[in-house]
Amino acid sequence: MSRVGILVLGPAGVGKSTFCNALITHIQSIGRRAHIVNLDPAAEPNEYEFTVDIRDLISLNDVMEEMELGPNGGLMYCFEFLLQNMDWLEEELGEFEDEYLIFDCPGQIELYTHVPVLPTIVKHLQRHMGFSLCACYILEAPFVLDRPKFFSGVLSAMSAMILLETPHINILSKMDLIKDEVPKRELKRFLNPDPLLMVDEANSQTNPKFHQLNLAITNMIEDFGMVQFLPLEAKNPDSVAAILSYLDDVTQWADNQEPKEPKVEEVEEEE
């Protein structure tokens, strides 16, 4: 039986921790067990207590103070230290066999685009710890109001999908913030990104010498055809339930569960 883990990724401020809290609330409300694993050494206080917290091993504030590093350099140091101490992570996660583990990851995409830190951790979780993983890459819905910014996020999501080499879904969070600003028909063109949206606006705002570059980027997005988004309103239980349904399918959660013995009371009632 493999264990199930959800990697929550995305830029800072898009609602990763809010999604983690909403997801664990829903999972627990339907009688399943779940825990949040914090992999952000600079994490702020959370609604739910972290079951496993990288700050128990190393924290960004301590590293910045002792090593005289900046935030990004300190973060890299923290993860290099974690990679040298993966036995600590194995020990912390060792007792959780049939629970849903939600990994709340830092917002710095450099951890998988510039250096293979997160990909290395993912491979270790899969190969040495028996995890069935799914990555959730989150962008916030207001990005659609700035098309170049949205398509920059699409490229980041595609980069994560390619470099992490793990099952993957993409989420457009904070949908309630754009309900009155974006018609449903146009929104569908963002949930299933239409490259023409970017070309039209980018070409109208940039020097003609960049038009070929804009076209090349949109063609690449279209050729890969990998990125689609699921809408999310974190305060809407039905919206969270829909996301969980996708996660269960991707991780084959039901197939990974061992049959449970009926309770004594249930057996007596049948008799």
From Swiss-Prot:
**Which keywords does this chain's UniProt record carry?**
GTP-binding, Hydrolase, Nucleotide-binding
UniProt xrefs under InterPro entries: Gpn, Gpn3, P-loop_NTPase
Q: Which GO terms describe its molecular function?
A: GTP binding; GTPase activity
Instruction: List the Pfam families hit by this protein, alphabetically.
Output: ATP_bind_1 (PF03029)
Motif Gly-Pro-Asn (GPN)-loop: which residue numbers?
Answer: 70-72
Site (Stabilizes the phosphate intermediate) found at N72
Q: Hey, what's the signal peptide range on this chain?
A: none
Q: Where does GTP bind?
A: G13, V14, G15, K16, S17, T18, S173, K174, M175, D176
Subunit structure of this entry? Heterodimers with GPN1 or GPN2. Binds to RNA polymerase II (RNAPII).
Q: Could you tell me what this protein does?
A: Small GTPase required for proper nuclear import of RNA polymerase II and III (RNAPII and RNAPIII). May act at an RNAP assembly step prior to nuclear import.
> Record's family?
Belongs to the GPN-loop GTPase family.
How is this protein named in the record? GPN-loop GTPase 3
